[in-house]
Each structure stands twice: as C-alpha cells, then as structure tokens.
C-alpha cells in the first residue's frame, strides 16, 4: 500500500532534521497525525513564525529577531574579547556559565572539506573583518573538540595570529570529540577560565 502523498511529504521533511533517519521520521509523522494533531499544528506554526522572524545578527551572525542581537547591543560586554563558536547552541552554553563577558562570532558550522564546507561557508571573511576592527585584542576559539572543530580552530588561529591578534583556545576538560552543546556548564566554565594561547 502506498502512503498518502501528504504523509510522504511530511516524512521527507522530518528526515532533513539531524539524526532523524527514515524510520524515525515515519514514526514521528505517524505519531503527530495519529496522537497529537494539535502539537503538529503548533509545531508548524512555530516553524513558520521562526522562519519569518529570525535573521542573523549583523555583527556576530547568531540568530536574532532584530538587526543586532541582545549580546552585541549590551554595553556592559567587553568589546576587546571575541569568542568564536560553531553554533548558537554553543553560544548559549557559554553564556550559561556566566564566566565570559566578551562578544561572540557564530560560524554556523565548521570546516569540513569532505562535505564541501570551506572558509566561505563558515563566514570566514566576516569573522576576519570583525576581529580586525581595531577594538578586539583577543580571539577565543571555542570550536568543538572534534576533528573538524580542531581543524577549524587551527585554520582560524593561524590566520588571525598572522593579523597580530592574540588567539586563545578553550582548555581541555571538554572531552575530545565533545560538542559544547552537550557539556555541562561547570566544565565549560573551567575550560573558558583555563583557555590557552595558540
């Protein structure tokens, strides 16, 4: 039996989510249609609202509803410190530690040549312009401790050091292969406080 095209379309859309394969997508779709139509409608409205209202901050590239995000607009932040993270989720984890009071730049990814992700795709030129504004004195590389995250940190570190900037890297404590989004706030706080020069 062939499933209805509307259901097939929903399953395909759910497969676009990270970590959701064909079977999981099908289970989610059936659950929403069979047991939680109200939740499905709420999910649809929330997705539509987010796509219509969220944009990238003109300064740091994170998600925001305004041209400039709340962090970049905060005069209490230290503009001489610029922390580079892979995702907005990583930025939120660092913020929850309450140990970092500088500004951010969100790459929205990491270098991965095998996947076709190079410097352009991680907004490298924007980062260099931001870091070279004459105000930033130290760039903290807080990319994940995965192979791609380490390669990204190395590439960024070499390039930014060549421009005369002090470049530091989060200290270990964040497990090798670990992603900041899944690390507890205490470990991230310790890694931020013990960051090292590159």
Swiss-Prot record:
Residues in C4-type zinc fingers: 57-72
Keywords from the named record: DNA damage, DNA recombination, DNA repair, Metal-binding, Zinc, Zinc-finger
Entry-linked PANTHER family: RECOMBINATION PROTEIN RECR
Domain Toprim positions: 80-175
Signal peptide start-end: none
A single BP term in Gene Ontology: DNA repair
Record function comment: May play a role in DNA repair. It seems to be involved in an RecBC-independent recombinational process of DNA repair. It may act with RecF and RecO.
Protein name as catalogued: Recombination protein RecR
Source organism, top-level taxon: Bacteria
MF term (GO), any: DNA binding
InterPro entries (alphabetical): DNA_Rcmb_RecR, Rcmb_RecR, Rcmb_RecR_Znf, TOPRIM_dom, TOPRIM_RecR
Keyword Zinc: yes
Family membership: Belongs to the RecR family.
SMART domains: TOPRIM
Source organism: Burkholderia vietnamiensis (strain G4 / LMG 22486)
